[in-house]
Amino acid sequence: MTDALMSASRVVLRAGALVPWLVLTAVVCAGVVLVDLVSAFFASAAFVLLGPLLPIAGLGLSYVPSVNVDYQLVVASPYSTLRLLLLRAAVFVALAAPVLLFCGHRLEGVQFGARVLAHTAAVVAVGLAQSTLMAPTLSAAVVSFAWMSLVQVVLMAGGLADITSSHAVALAVCTAVAALFVLVVRRRALSTDWRYS
């Protein structure tokens, strides 16, 4: 009986580690729907601005000890830093994919959601590659700021169609591939400061 209660409490604690990310996802979804009621353009722009930040925010938050209840287990794990980083990134992209596809379909169709998902993969890949220079939490913050700045510049210079065009998606895919190549080449330079903080 006691073992069953202990294992159930562990499951609840592990599920509790996703609460900040789930709240962030719910806020973004609610914001997209709310803005969609006001104006379709602003909803799409907000979705393109905030959608790709969901996985990178989750990845950055997962390396904060006060948020992640399994932090000590990760620190003591025998796996390489590259493997831990890639597994976490894959989990957060997989969790964000249905949300992005659903909201994209709600706004402008399935293609729109898939194109935003391509940008999401590029943002996460650049964040992973940048983790070879700094801690994953700082890397996530820097990449998020860079993405928001890039979207603002493109929206001011052109329009939403420029961000979701096939050329922009091809550039995002090439950026993701190049960033993952940099990550693999520089894997020995991955910051491990988070393991000892």
Question: What are the functions of these language-model segments?
Answer:
Residues 1-44, 132, 171-197:
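Hydrophobic alpha-helical transmembrane segments
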Residues 28-30, 55-58, 80:
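Short, mixed-charge, low-aromatic patches
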Residues 29-33, 145-156:
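Aromatic-anchored segments of alpha-helical transmembrane domains
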Residues 40-68, 86-152:
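Secretory targeting signals
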Residues 48, 167-170:
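Juxtamembrane helix-entry segments on the extracytoplasmic side of multipass membrane proteins
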Residues 75-81:
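Short helix-to-coil transition segments within interhelical loops
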Residues 156-168:
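Extracellular/periplasmic helix-loop-helix junctions in multi-pass membrane proteins
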